[in-house]
Amino acid sequence: MSSASQEQLLKDQNIIVFGEDFGRHAHSLEHLLRPLFPYNQWIWVETIGIRSPKFSIYDLRRIFEKLTKWFKPQVTHEGIEVPENITIVRPLMIPFNQYGIIRRLNRWSVNRTVGRALQARGMATVLSIYSIPNAADYIGDFNETLKVYVCVDEFSLWPGLNYKMVKNMEDLLLKKSDLVFATSKSLQKTKSNGKSETFLLTHGVEFQHFNIGPKALSSNHPLQICYFGLFDERSDQKILKDIASSLPEEQIHIYGNVVCSIDELTNFKNIHFHGPVPYKKLPQVISAMDIFILPYVRNELTENINPLKLKEYLSTGRPVIATGLPEVAAYKDHLYLGNDSQDFIEHIKAIKAGKSLDTQKTLEYLAANETWVAKAKFFSSEILKRLP
């Protein structure tokens, strides 16, 4: 990174982060902050989630993972190396935050553990950055000079969450925050601290990582159609079933954690679930794919999201078909929009027959404007304006 680039980044700060687990999977807050890692001192706090666990394989694995990591503080998922200037803090916590006594115990544990880490690192002055609603219980307890909220989702509408509890948490979080960013225009309109402007900060992309180059298509061979990312209730399974049944020769590949029922999809011989793939290995795995698809159910939750994977798919330089959510429709000149199964099927047929878009313009735009470094610079500039 050039010295000119460095000058625009936040530097020489002590920062507490409340977000998803460090290095567990490629999430937006970690992507955003990664360009700032070398220039600041960090305490990264891993708390429990806001959803009460259920008796499922996924949740049991998460519980085991959490228990294991409590005893190995600097070990991350997939063994990712943690820089020396980042201290990972994993307070001992109990799920079921909806119960007042447990919530108070968790707050005590977090404050005690983080306080010790701050003292050990000699961090007397700090700022906090957070992207999860339950951070409301902890921010402001560490005498921060600035409290920064990066809102990445409408968490209160997530399936399985306690709407009232999460809504109250986020209302308190917004009230405590000095600076608020939102990753979509719809979130920007609804997330305000009542004191200052909420800034639009859309997701970036690690462009070079995903720019795998074009691939020639053949009408004589089955298409390899790909979805990678978290597969959950937001994913439109009807679209996938209709593609699989209408185009039985084409092969659909799904990479990522699955956290919803997929019983109906597993009946199709041309739908393949491969499980999660480490972020570093994704380019190699997806290099054989012809088309990337983002099929979403349309509802209040998805209308608020800005899919993190969208720009990653576009950066491949290969055809992308996606449900026309508001943040996706903004890229209508760079991809194929599909509002139902028939749209997706017709686009796939047209692409196989030779239809194409000017991907070079897309790639040039993403490389020049949408990298995570560019996002980190904007993020830094707004913070620097407000630091004492």
Stretches with model-predicted labels:
Residues 186, 201-207:
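Carbohydrate-associated surface elements
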Residues 218-235, 240-244, 253-255:
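Conserved donor-binding/catalytic core segment of Leloir-type glycosyltransferases
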Residues 235, 280-285, 292-315, 322-333:
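Nucleotide-sugar-dependent
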Residues 355-385:
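A charged, aromatic-enriched C-terminal amphipathic alpha-helix characteristic of glycosyltransferases
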Residues 157-163, 192, 205-221, 263, ...:
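Acidic anion/phosphate-binding donor-loop and adjacent secondary structure
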Residues 32, 112-119, 123, 162-180:
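Membrane-proximal helix-turn-helix segments that form the acceptor-binding/catalytic region
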Residues 261-283:
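Nucleotide-activated donor-binding/catalytic signature segment of Leloir-type glycosyltransferases, i.e.
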